[in-house]
Amino acid sequence: MTVKTPVYLDYAATTPVDKRVAEKMIPYLTETFGNPASNSHAFGWEAEEAVEKARADIAALINADPKEIVFTSGATESDNLAIKGAANFYKTKGKHLITVKTEHKAVLDTMRELERQGFEVTYLGVQENGLIDLEELKAAIRDDTILISVMWANNEIGVVQDIPAIGEICRERKIVFHVDAAQACGKVPVDVEAAKIDLLSMSAHKVYGPKGIGALYVRRKPRVRLEAQMHGGGHERGFRSGTLPTHQIVGMGEAFRIAKEELEQDMAHYRKLRDIFLKGIEGIEEVYINGDLEHRAPNNLNVSFNFVEGESLIMAVKELAVSSGSACTSASLEPSYVLRALGRNDELAHSSLRITFGRMTTEEEVQFAAELIKSKIGKLRELSPLWEMFKDGIDLNSIEWAAH
């Protein structure tokens, strides 16, 4: 089996631009280069037409109205605009916000910033499977709660929360509901109407579109108000000023159009690859799947291999492009805060691999990856004194280690 290495299995970090998307973008760099806001000539009109077509394609994937789509530079900006924008607009009603400990840093750090500004934030824990307890969420709601932010699919463990149920709770209590859907679009069905979502963050580069472009869905009925975070020429109905990058927007629109058209086959492809991988690592002892396998984005696997050091594991499988933790925070040596929130100990949190499949991943590549990981785990454990002790039946938790 000849597989070209390194094999890219880090699609949750980013995806290559689909060739169909790249082709669609090129004319808007050199030919149809007008500013979409120039409304006095054909160059501007053509660019605006392309932007509106993309807006409609993006809206279609999430079952929204095109007028509800606001272009941003990516999901991080969308999260900032949604959370800061809503918190500041509705702060006269109350200053209490609710989110989850396993959210992306773009949400958590935005919440921290709002705490510095005098807001109060409740960070909900998760169960061992990564799902929040809806009763706990209900109990956390107060009369002064104005916003709840819960991600659709987790970037590290792929766990999919019960978004429609949370949407129901928020609508009933008239609380603004924000959802970070960067990892959900194109991987699971997303419907903002059915799920009663008020604000939804999206990114193009997680869906085979270009980097540097994203969008925020802002509900019109019932209308959700935001305070702008970027001031200027009043573009995007005043929500987000700045000249629209037509080529990027066209790319995102085409990527989302394809994602809607090919969602079923993409999902089936991911499930098949996931099953092949899980079958391939069967028989390795002390393997823990992190996060619920049922309620999960089909392209994500996060696996901890006990008695193996995470960093040495990444080095050992250098023919695979995989990650430990998310790409945004994998530079730090701290164990993943997401895995810690599941109750995993430091050792298991440190020995995790996030393997995420994509549209271009082949069955051969996944087979190769599973076999490689299996053989390397065996070799690394042979070198581990802890593994030897574990195999000898020694309870490692009962050992008193001498301090040096």
From Swiss-Prot:
Name its species: Neisseria meningitidis serogroup C / serotype 2a (strain ATCC 700532 / DSM 15464 / FAM18)
Indicate whether Nucleus appears among the record's keywords.
no
What GO terms fall under cellular component here? L-cysteine desulfurase complex
Q: What is this protein called?
A: Cysteine desulfurase IscS
Lineage of producing organism: Bacteria, Pseudomonadati, Pseudomonadota, Betaproteobacteria, Neisseriales
Query: Which PANTHER family does the annotation name?
Result: CYSTEINE DESULFURASE, CYSTEINE DESULFURYLASE FAMILY MEMBER
Required co-factors: pyridoxal 5'-phosphate
Q: Where the protein is mainly located, per its record? A: cytoplasm
Q: Which Pfam families match?
A: Aminotran_5
Q: What Enzyme Commission number(s) appear in the record?
A: 2.8.1.7
